Amino acid sequence: MEFVAKLFKFFKDLLGKFLGNY
């Protein structure tokens, strides 16, 4: 499902930003 893949990528990028700040 393309929607789930986009959602997963969005959360992964968001998590990467959070981890990048610390």
Swiss-Prot record:
Positions of transmembrane segments: none
Annotated keywords: Cytolysis, Virulence
Annotated GO biological process: killing of cells of another organism
Pfam families reported in the protein's UniProt record: PSMalpha
The UniProt record lists the keyword Amino-acid biosynthesis: no
InterPro entries assigned: PSM_alpha, PSM_alpha_peptides
UniProt feature coiled coil, ranges: none
Biological role stated in the UniProt entry: Peptide which can recruit, activate and subsequently lyse human neutrophils, thus eliminating the main cellular defense against infection.
Family named by the database record: Belongs to the phenol-soluble modulin alpha peptides family.
Descriptive protein name: Phenol-soluble modulin alpha 3 peptide
Naturally occurring in which organism (per UniProt): Staphylococcus aureus (strain MRSA252)
GN (gene name): psmA3
